[in-house]
Amino acid sequence: MNVMQENQIKLIEHIKQAVVQAVGLPEVEVPEILLEVPKDKKHGDYSTNIAMQLARVAKKAPRQIAESIVPELKKDNKLIKEVEIAGPGFINFYLDNAYLTELVPVILTEDHKYGESDFGKGEKFQIEFVSANPTGDLHLGHARGAAIGDSLANIMKMAGFDVSREYYINDAGNQINNLVLSAEARYFEALGLESEFPEDGYRGADIISLGKDLAAKYGDKYVNTSEEERRSVFRVDALAFETGKLRADLEEFRVSFDEWFSETSLYEENKVLPALERLRENGYIYEQDGATWLRTTDFEDDKDRVLIKSDGSYTYFLPDIAYHLNKLERGFDVLIDIWGADHHGYIPRMRAAIEALGYSPNQLEVEIIQLVHLFEDGVQVKMSKRTGKSVTMRDLIEEVGLDATRYFFAMRSSDTHMNFDMSLAKSTSNDNPVYYVQYAHARISSILRSGKEQGLEVTKDADMSLLQTEAEYDLLKVLGEFADVVAEAAAKRAPHRIVRYLNDLATAFHRFYNSNKVLDMDNLEVTQARLSLIKTAQITLRNGLTLLGVSAPEKM
């Protein structure tokens, strides 16, 4: 628990005791006291509507109740500088800023751990994201999903959740058969032999490369073998080739997974039919027109869903149900699936399946990643300059840089369409959001280096009471909000709140820097205090950027 949280608890307790004294309520009957941070700091550091909550019980107007509470609040509390009543009965608090200086040694001590909390209480979450078919390059939607999924996992972990990251490899569908047939055709081609290319095959340069690899590895060994034997071998190689590419691209994007789960394993380990039988035992399966159906309309889906078609083949829905059952049986309390925009209509049926399996529908959350449109100099970009094809994640990283790509994708709520301004992302000006935040970190690093060259080291023992200016206090207030912002971003599944916070922190630092001289050799005690202060800002900027998978440069 940080200093800000401790003081909120103290303030809430003080308000509760003031209510007991002023209104005459027993402590157990005092309603939950909520503190809000006013949008305009002119209205105080905190505000509460407790007087309005008490109006019915006290049978008085809220403002009259507030007037009776305020004198009690002013008694014997060093934390409160001033209290005022606003509007119909809001009570606004102005705190004594001296408490803020207690943050500095705390942040310096916690360092990389600053921002951590036990908000999540160790609840086990699994976040499954990206999960692109292993048949080609990652596109912009995958990139946005990767950035948001990884950032969310980082944020939730810092907020005290037990988080596992998973990639579901769709390696059992027709697309894999087409991949194998494409690799086979390119294998024959690499050997100088004629081969008919599959109608729905994959024609990318990577498949040509795969065919050459197969020819180099096996020579003509599989030219005259049976199709079954050849394709069985090539399937393993093709999947290893494609998933290897995906892993490499994601690792470069600073995204890693705890588990790469193969769809094929569901069949190999006999996980699909037991899931079907569980649904049947629970009474939600019926047969009609030669097909097997799941009665999802019992759970507010708009129609029932086919699991096994009349020809005996499975729909995609059945192995998906088996996969989600497998995840829940692994002991996760909540599953978070991050899906593309084209999967929005899939949510009701999957929630229905979770409930039909006997679990709470609240154990499945789905975050939808909306579409990304690229713009450069105000013109929409649809094709890569390098390849003449659709822009891939790798293309975008090469064009604007890894940090800008990660940061920009985290800037907006995942369920909103995104116009990605490539010109802005490449800009080295304060108009570029990631540059603005990174520059604050680099500037602090530069000041700290200059201080060190003059024999000044950051210390926890500096006299922080010497921090007296409004800009110093404003910076401290923003610094103190970090753990709460992380917890809120985790609770709301909203990485963009970290982006917003980092912008606010960078702004607070720049204002402080523009109005206060940090290195003043004629006033070493104040200099020492300010060095410690900016070090805490550096730590917090770095920790926030790290949550987003963005670097915190020492120089720019």
Curated annotation (Swiss-Prot):
Its EC number is 6.1.1.19. GO terms for cellular component: cytoplasm. GO terms for biological process: arginyl-tRNA aminoacylation. GO terms for molecular function: arginine-tRNA ligase activity; ATP binding. The keyword Phosphoprotein does not apply. CDD domains: Anticodon_Ia_Arg, ArgRS_core. The keyword Kinase does not apply. It catalyses: tRNA(Arg) + L-arginine + ATP = L-arginyl-tRNA(Arg) + AMP + diphosphate. It is an enzyme of class 6 (ligase). It is found in: Cytoplasm. Keywords: Aminoacyl-tRNA synthetase, ATP-binding, Cytoplasm, Ligase, Nucleotide-binding, Protein biosynthesis. InterPro entries: aa-tRNA-synth_I_CS, Arg-tRNA-ligase, Arg-tRNA-synth_N, Arg-tRNA-synth_N_sf, ArgRS_core, DALR_anticod-bd, Rossmann-like_a/b/a_fold, tRNAsynth_Ia_anticodon-bd. A motif ('HIGH' region) lies at residues 132-142. Pfam families: Arg_tRNA_synt_N, DALR_1, tRNA-synt_1d. Monomer. Belongs to the class-I aminoacyl-tRNA synthetase family. NCBIfam families: argS. This is Arginine--tRNA ligase. The lineage of its organism: Bacteria, Bacillati, Bacillota, Bacilli, Bacillales.
